[in-house]
Structures are given as structure tokens and as C-alpha cells.
């Protein structure tokens, strides 16, 4: 494996950023962690990966706005935007491409995007090897039911990527034991601008639709944390449990 040089001794990490609540708090948390551990600013590279999904334009817009505010501005590198198209792999009628998002009460298992994390990590790891970044931080939470979000998966991917790239690279999932409401509480402590985060599969003018299952997940987490979600909604359910 190729090691970091003396001049690159400070931490150099990539953080996958989707513009959503979890990745925003993850980025802020990494800034905080490294500022405490280091005497000088670490290289923290936020990365957004486009795959051709219908919600991505709104995600990018929100991410760019968010990074212009504390606690991010002046603390991270400019957003790196990579492309990893999946439109030639998924059927043309797939809901993630058409914008026909799963309904509010859809089970989490039904929104699994096959191969999503495999493709993301493959693309981002090549970027990391080229740019001498030594860690990728990702944001799955406790209870994530998908096979490409388990500790075993991340360990296996880490080994394969290090071997294939001949580059020392760690994959970390710091929030793997946290619930979404716990992530919200951490984000409050870190002054994350939740009003600019977007966790929606069918945004309307860069606002949450309030009708998809990602909006349900977000609204219910804020409700369990006894907080109002400050982000804008095209439709905001009065009851987060029913979506009405």
C-alpha cells in the first residue's frame, strides 16, 4: 500500500454528501472531531455523486447553499461533484428515474436502490486514490435494512478497494449506531442549518414534497426529537405518523 508523505501528514478525508440531514450532520461532526484532534485544519473533502436520479438537481442546489454557511464555510474544500450514471442500468420506468416516488407509508425495504453504495464507493475511492485522500466517511444509521450498509459490507469493500487501488483507504460509518433523532440532536449541538438540508425523493421547487417515504422518515424523526423541522415543505402533514 502507498502511505501518505510527510507533507500530507494531516488527516485527508472524503465525506459523501447528498444534501440530506444525515450527511450534513456527518460533515459537521467530522469537522468538529478533527478540529479537536488536530492543531491545524484537516483536509475535508465533501463529495456529491450524481447518478441520474430525479431529485439530484435539488440536492445539489441545497448542498451548495448549505456549504456557504457555518459550520462548513472555511472549514472544508469546495464541493467535488462526480458522475456515476446508473440510467443505463435501471429500467427506464424505475421510480428513482421517473420521479414517481414511493408513497408516504411505503416500507423502507421497498426503496432499496440496488448497487447504490457499491457504485458510490467505487467511484469515490478512485477519486480518493488520485487525490491522496485516506478515508471515506459515509452516513448509514442504526436500523438501516440494506445489505450494502452493514459493517461487514463496508469492511469487505475497504479490503477490496485497498487491494485494487494500492492505496491506504478506510471506510468509516460513524453514525451506524445512532437513530435519526439522535443525529438531529447532534446536529443541533453542531449548529447544522437543517433548513437547507433536503431529504426527499420528489422535491418541489427545492422543497420537501411532504408525501414520500423519505419525508415521512424525516418528519417522524423530528417529532420523536420533540422538534419542528425548519426545512420548507410544499405540503406539510399535520400528523407525521399518518402523513395527513
What kind of feature is each model-predicted range?
Residues 191-197:
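A short alpha-helix-loop-beta-strand transition element characteristic
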Residues 136, 201-207, 227-235:
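Charge-dense, low-complexity polyampholytic segments
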Residues 216-244:
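Short Fe-S-cluster ligation motifs
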Residues 122, 198-220:
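Local cysteine-cluster metal-coordination motifs and their immediate loop/turn environment
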Residues 154, 183, 213-214, 238-242:
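Alpha-helix boundary/capping detector
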Residues 30-31, 35, 135, 198, ...:
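Amphipathic, positively biased hydrophobic alpha-helical segments used for protein targeting
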Residues 2-191:
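ATP-dependent adenylation/nucleotidyltransferase module used to activate substrates
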